């Protein structure tokens, strides 16, 4: 016990209130950004329905010229984004209309003709086109939420059974609360960076749930072991020692993963790959949140048992 107590480097008892206050500030700031003009929740056509039309081109085309041409054909709200293939041999721009702003086949042909005439020197060609009805999008969104809820249910069952010695259901609820906060962090990241919520976001959420839960279980294992080795110690001291002894392992794992994800972010920004960006950016923030919440979330609940 004496040897383990010497391993304490950070007193999480003192930092708990500050961390919880920081959580509250981040949460309120995230909620506020939802209602700030220009930010808000932006749904991809997979969740909100609509149409995406992509064109390949050569040379350089200005966003303003694309927007002016599209406005001359479509009297609907839209966004334009550019991307370049990793090999650098294919440039595309995508016109997205979300919600009920779908585009008929006739209008797509008219738009293609207008763009071809406007950028006659840029070899404009239709790259791909995709439309999703609001009904289908709503069904996909519902199924995605159900998948996340089922995952949360299995988390409660698994953690509750495996760690019944250190709280059982209380331990499971603690882990779930930490996971919920991590999900909110990824959501607020999308709002702040004006990223569309698409199928990539669901992949991020499910990945973060598994990643953060793994960190939490590592600490729980330490708590269970140290509770047996330190029978005369207060539970707060046991938890404090457990977090510190697993801190190096979790920090190295999180840092390694974070660097890898930030590499993906850099590539997505360099080549304008929006699909990679909507995955990597919230993933990076989710990793940081998961590393913090796996320790402080456990501390906040187990210490009060």
What are these regions (language model features)?
Residues 1-305:
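A structural signal for conserved, well-ordered secondary-structure elements
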């Amino acid at each position: 016990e004496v040897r383990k107590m010497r391993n304490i480097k950070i007193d999480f008892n003192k930092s708990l209130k500050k961390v919880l206050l920081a959580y509250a500030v981040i949460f309120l700031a995230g909620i506020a950004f939802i209602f700030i003009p220009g930010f808000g929740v932006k749904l991809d056509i997979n969740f909100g329905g609509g149409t995406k039309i992509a064109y390949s081109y050569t040379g350089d085309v200005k966003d303003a010229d694309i927007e002016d041409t599209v406005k001359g054909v479509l009297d609907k709200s839209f966004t334009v984004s550019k991307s370049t293939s990793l090999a650098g041999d294919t440039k595309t721009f995508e016109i997205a209309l979300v919600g009920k702003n779908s585009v008929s086949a006739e209008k797509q042909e008219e738009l293609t003709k207008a763009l071809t005439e406007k950028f006659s020197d840029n070899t404009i060609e239709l790259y791909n086109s995709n439309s999703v009805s609001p009904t289908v999008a709503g069904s996909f969104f519902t199924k995605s939420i159900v998948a996340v809820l089922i995952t949360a249910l299995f988390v409660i069952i698994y953690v509750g059974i495996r760690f019944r010695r250190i709280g059982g259901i209380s331990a499971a609820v603690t882990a779930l609360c930490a996971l919920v906060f991590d999900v909110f962090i990824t959501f607020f990241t999308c709002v702040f960076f004006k990223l569309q919520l698409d199928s990539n976001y669901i992949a991020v959420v499910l990945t973060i749930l598994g990643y953060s839960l793994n960190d939490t279980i590592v600490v729980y294992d330490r708590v269970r072991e140290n509770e047996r080795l330190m029978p005369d110690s207060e539970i707060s001291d046991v938890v404090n020692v457990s977090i510190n002894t697993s801190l190096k392992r979790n920090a190295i794992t999180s840092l390694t993963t974070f660097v890898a994800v930030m590499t993906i972010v850099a590539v997505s920004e360099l080549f304008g790959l929006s699909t990679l960006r909507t995955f990597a950016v919230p993933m990076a923030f989710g990793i940081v949140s998961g590393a913090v919440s796996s320790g402080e979330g456990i501390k906040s609940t187990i210490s009060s048992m």
